[in-house]
Amino acid sequence: MAKANVSPGMQQYLDIKKDYPDAFLLFRMGDFYELFYEDAVKAAQILEIGLTSRNKNADNPIPMAGVPYHSVQQYIDVLIDLGHKVAIAEQMEDPKQAVGVVKREVVQVITPGTAVDSSRPDSPNNFLVAVDFDGKAYGLSYMDVSTGEFFATDLADFASVKSEIQNLKAKEVLLGFELSEEEQAILVKQLNLLLSFEMTALEDSPLIDHQLTAVELSAAGKLLHYVHQTQLRELSHLQALVHYDIKDYLQMSYATKSSLDLLENARTGKKHGSLYWLLDETKTAMGMRLLRAWIDRPLVTSEAILERQEIIQVFLNAFIERTDLSDSLKGVYDIERLSSRVSFGKANPKDLLQLGHTLAKVPYIKAILEAFNSPYLDKLVNQIDTLPELEHLIRSAIDPDAPATINEGNIIRTGFDERLDHYRKVMREGTGWIADIETKERQASGISNLKIDYNKKDGYYFHVTNSNLGMVPDHFFRKATLKNSERYGTAELAKIEGQMLEAREESSSLEYDIFMRIRAQVETYIDRLQQLAKALATVDVLQSLAVVAEKNHYVRPLFNQESKIAIDNGRHAVVEKVLGVQEYIPNSISFGPQTSIQLITGPNMSGKSTYMRQLALTVIMAQIGSFVAAESASLPLFDAIFTRIGAADDLISGQSTFMVEMMEANHAIKRATPHSLILFDELGRGTATYDGMALAQSIIEYIHDRVGAKTMFATHYHELTELSTKLTKLVNVHVATLEKDGNVTFLHKIAEGPADKSYGIHVARIAGLPEDLLARADTVLTKLEAQSQARESVLSTTEVRETQQLANQQLSLFTDDGSSSEIIKRLESVDVMNLTPIQAMTVLYELKKLL
């Protein structure tokens, strides 16, 4: 990639850049990282930094932009957040000692999925995902390079892959198989991530268990290869690969988690107002991340849930000890990410001090846990390794006032190394020795204004003015002559100066070497530190759940095998927290073993959606091991939650509200089991009234007859309430209202039976619509109700079957016609649920041509 008339330094830049064409190359030159050519032009615009040029007077000056080395991280963060890659080229030798061009090499490539530096201590996991396909199944592997966590699973279809990527909130995905450009574009737009291809797998890694499926191994190997290619060093903090099965956790799509505000408020994108916000009383960054993981993946086995419940109960029963435990955890730093900084060779003295400070607290934390005297805590207590030898090393080696950088000195504590102590003594006492020499020579020479000065060129010297030159002693030797004075030295002064300079240089070099050795020793403890981090994070989350349970008067839920739901005076935990206990109206929820569907009717704003979400959050809280917002609760264990709550177009995919509704309904009824929970709110409203009602009825019947999942179905189609006479496992409930003197009060209380009215006009009145408009609406409503009284809107199950048979007979009349046969074949090949509106129009046009 040589260019004519470029300097050797620029040729070096071009040679390196050709290996990293898709990354911004930050090229270290002295105290700056420079960018050139197109990188400089783009970076100047993105980072809002000055754009200049190299060789300004040349015919084709080279665009150039730069950032100071000490603030480079903030600029890297901006580029990474925008989805770019950044390659860091460092100087590999001292420029003062270099012969010719300073040797430079890329030491790291930072990408959205491998970024580890963050100014936020509470920042969530940053997962890099790799996906492979063997023609039958997909292998998916993911890693957080900042913590070393490493996982893999296999999935049956690409829809599951996309869902898992969304749930992980991955910023970068590696594909190990070919994907069309159209599919790539859709994936990038839908998931808002950086997509790369990685076809080379790292084989025979000790981190990978070869008992995994071949496609999992391939995905994990390709992920590891990419990490090694970008980080360009051995990473000792990477943990052994853990296989997981999505069926081991309560399955929820990203849309479901979003609609339930599990990790963030869907309307604001903030933590406040989410279940995570409610449950977070953690004291450590590790605990915060683990709590997010628990909320994201609730359990499905009672043994693991009960184990968590027992520990929460132990903490609840001992307020003083739990408070002491919480206070002690406040001083625990992020061991996981400190370990990764050690592994990356980036840990500074402050990092080691934080690690040492944490280790100093661990014995006391362990003692507190032992003081609970509970067998349920034995497992956790045994996992807490106090690492006394590492704590002693850091405490005895690192000065408590050490700076954040490793080149400022004053890192190593006095008394740790004899040579270093000697050099420091020379530097400390050398100043006094020089003062003594100055006093002695002033008295001996009789030169009253004789003094010793220092500069980099001449070192230490005696300053003698011209008027006193005749009094200069014989053992003085001239070092420099100035206009009005001369500079002299002596053998004694030179000796002391030599000792001080040697001490300064040797001290700096020795202190750096000692710190590197200590950091290398710390690295040997990374495995034990990571195990300690997991144990402390678990303790932190469990104490957090205990604190939340006590503050909010939650109860311990029970689990039953009778497939019944019995929640007495339950509350929507998040809404209650926002409104306050006094304002919130609780609701009991009951599903008997023979009840599978609650059909919920009632006006808008009355609380139907809150009631449905209340059940979902209660289930999720129970299955992460938390206590729940109710007076009592008995639940079955659910394997999945499916929701359709709220309406919105998917503009990126070109899908309308109704199409999204139907796709989510299809996803639910095809994947749900009798152990699942389905929440459908106003399904069918995105199309014409009778179309919507017909679909709603058919979906309810399908769930009732074929799926058997516990289902809440909220609707404004009051005609559907008649289904309770035909479907034995369906019950009607409604949101109670109080109507008096023309005024309507929503009681936000669930009652048995169907609602008698929708009160839509009353809601419109609350919204402030003009009274004359509302009066006209009342007139129209009365007329429409009169017209529909004689008409039965819900077909019986028998009528549905007869109608279907008639449709089949009518269709068979045309089977001998060639064009009809072609139309049927074309229709059978169409994947209706995955059509965009534009694609649907194209299909209709093709069918029309066949007529």
Curated annotation (Swiss-Prot):
Going by the UniProt record, its keywords in alphabetical order are: ATP-binding, DNA damage, DNA repair, DNA-binding, Nucleotide-binding
Transmembrane region(s): none
User: Which residues of this UniProt protein bind ATP?
Assistant: 602-609
Q: Which domain of life is it from?
A: Bacteria
Is Nucleotide-binding given among the entry's keywords? yes
Q: Does the keyword ATP-binding apply?
A: yes
Any one Gene Ontology BP term: mismatch repair
Task: Tell me the InterPro entries matching this sequence.
Answer: DNA_mismatch_repair_MutS, DNA_mismatch_repair_MutS-lik_N, DNA_mismatch_repair_MutS/MSH, DNA_mismatch_repair_MutS_C, DNA_mismatch_repair_MutS_clamp, DNA_mismatch_repair_MutS_core, DNA_mismatch_repair_MutS_N, DNA_mismatch_repair_MutS_sf
Q: Which GO terms describe its cellular component?
A: cytosol
Give GO MF terms, alphabetically: ATP binding; ATP-dependent DNA damage sensor activity; damaged DNA binding; mismatched DNA binding
Q: Which PANTHER family does UniProt cross-reference here?
A: DNA MISMATCH REPAIR PROTEIN MSH1, MITOCHONDRIAL, DNA MISMATCH REPAIR PROTEIN MUTS FAMILY MEMBER
The entry assigns this protein to a family as follows: Belongs to the DNA mismatch repair MutS family.
Task: Tell me, in a sentence or two, what this protein's role is.
Answer: This protein is involved in the repair of mismatches in DNA. It is possible that it carries out the mismatch recognition step. This protein has a weak ATPase activity.
**Name used for this protein in its record:** DNA mismatch repair protein MutS
Source organism per UniProt: Streptococcus equi subsp. equi (strain 4047)
Taxonomic lineage is: Bacteria, Bacillati, Bacillota, Bacilli, Lactobacillales
